[in-house]
Amino acid sequence: MRKGEPKTLRDAHEVVMDRRPPKDANPSVWLAFRLGNARLYKAVADVDRGHHHEALYWAGYEERQAGEISAELQAEAKSAD
């Protein structure tokens, strides 16, 4: 991790909430947000060993959310063809 990055699960949650896009943001913005969160939580899982499994849960959650958004974007693209 680079200097200044979250080192605890709590810090990661705060970063996620601070950078959360508006509810009406473009789905591609939400996709980038979710994928970034997944990377963040995976990195924190390696550092905050006391919350390793919980951080991995959140990484998986964010990946699932990203998968849903990606599927919606693909469905929209197919229907536009």
Locations of regions flagged by a protein language model:
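Long, non-catalytic architectural segments outside compact domain cores
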Residues: M1-D81
